[in-house]
Amino acid sequence: MSRYKKQQSPFYQGDLIFIFGVFFIISVVSIYAAGQFGQYGNTDWIQQIVFYLLGAVAITVLLYFDLEQLEKLSLYIFIIGILSLIILKISPESIAPVIKGAKSWFRIGRITIQPSEFMKVGLIMMLASVIGKANPKGVRTLRDDIHLLLKIAGVAVIPVGLILMQDAGTAGICMFIVLVMVFMSGINWKLIAIIAGSGILLISLILLVMINFPDVAKSVGIQDYQIKRVTSWVSASNETQEDSNDSWQVDQAIMAIGSGGILGNGISNLKVYVPESTTDFIFSIIGESFGFIGCAIVVIMFFFLIYRLVVLIDKIHPFNRFASFFCVGYTALIVIHTFQNIGMNIGIMPVTGIPLLFVSYGGSSTLSTLIGFGIVYNASVQLTKYRSYLFNS
């Protein structure tokens, strides 16, 4: 018997490939099912295949960079993201139209690009670089922690502020990511408690103003459609006609999920019309088409991905802090998107236009998610190489 055991290529990460493949199938089949109502035609599922193929190319390209190179690129990617948000803000409506009350997309012909989706990945990369470079030996003082907090605030305030002007949902996602990365950075828990408490107080104050003083909320830049979404969520028993119209799509989503039962009605036998069924409410299509079993599979896949990310965070931290903190931010992104999207589909969270990552239709959302996934895949490959080197040395 040979004394040398054949080693598998470090580029083969079977569990991550499995996750990619399962989400690809779920996404394409669900979008195809949603198209049966004819509200989007029957071509969106084909476009989603193209988005996934482009994402696969992006993942492959990212594997040619080592983690140190990606960290160096984080500043440039972050700056490009900031500039794209500024250009979007000042662009005429001919190339940056207002859609559903928000000026969040560039439109060039039939192509639409949402810069805020890519900004989320750029923000995570930049924060991972800043946090990763702070006190790598673990010896820190209160002054060090405050200095790091100021750096994090300096990185986050501009993109979050620019996004908040038009898209409160995405801005909220970014703020959640920042808070999670701050919490995991090792900063003194007392400072974190102050920040978390201040954040909860601020959010509560904003919600209070939106619900009880909508005119005041509008005067400080909060959009009318955002106020309607919040009021329809918290005041279902005392709805105005406008609020009732806003909550109707949630009622339809709940009805669709309920009609699917245990095994679902199949992709060609959908009976409940759900608006935005390929994007915001794709989970309701899964529920009606594949029932409780289909919904459970989706949730289990997200738990599997999150578990894989948590394991990677722990194992790669001694080798590369940038990769570890990027995985922290990416995990936060997956968690909040999944919780918010599924939550609004079952009526426990307000409608915010947040897609179900990996599953919802959309070029910007799918590509940015897969770019982040590519960096995670790269980190997993590099970890395999590190451990193989240590084992064989």
Curated annotation (Swiss-Prot):
Its gene name is rodA
Known PROSITE patterns for this protein?
Answer: FTSW_RODA_SPOVE
Q: What is this protein called?
A: Peptidoglycan glycosyltransferase RodA
HAMAP family, per the entry:
PGT_RodA
Q: What function does the entry list?
A: Peptidoglycan polymerase that is essential for cell wall elongation. Also required for the maintenance of the rod cell shape.
User: What organism is this sequence from?
Assistant: Bacillus subtilis (strain 168)
Q: Which family does it belong to?
A: Belongs to the SEDS family. MrdB/RodA subfamily.
**Chief place where the protein resides:** membrane
Entry superkingdom: Bacteria
> What reaction does this enzyme carry out catalytically?
[GlcNAc-(1->4)-Mur2Ac(oyl-L-Ala-gamma-D-Glu-L-Lys-D-Ala-D-Ala)](n)-di-trans,octa-cis-undecaprenyl diphosphate + beta-D-GlcNAc-(1->4)-Mur2Ac(oyl-L-Ala-gamma-D-Glu-L-Lys-D-Ala-D-Ala)-di-trans,octa-cis-undecaprenyl diphosphate = [GlcNAc-(1->4)-Mur2Ac(oyl-L-Ala-gamma-D-Glu-L-Lys-D-Ala-D-Ala)](n+1)-di-trans,octa-cis-undecaprenyl diphosphate + di-trans,octa-cis-undecaprenyl diphosphate + H(+)
InterPro entries recorded: Cell_cycle_FtsW-rel_CS (IPR018365), FtsW/RodA (IPR001182), RodA/MrdB (IPR011923)
- This protein's GO CC annotations: cell division site; plasma membrane
Q: Does the keyword Glycoprotein apply?
A: no
Induction info: Induced by the ECF sigma factor SigM.
Q: Any idea which GO molecular function terms this record carries? A: lipid-linked peptidoglycan transporter activity; peptidoglycan glycosyltransferase activity
Q: What further note is attached to this protein's record? A: Increased expression mediated by SigM is both necessary and sufficient to confer intrinsic resistance to moenomycin and viability to cells lacking aPBPs.
Q: Membrane topology for this entry?
A: Multi-pass membrane protein
**Principal EC category:** transferase
Keywords from the UniProt entry? Cell membrane, Cell shape, Cell wall biogenesis/degradation, Glycosyltransferase, Membrane, Peptidoglycan synthesis, Transferase, Transmembrane, Transmembrane helix
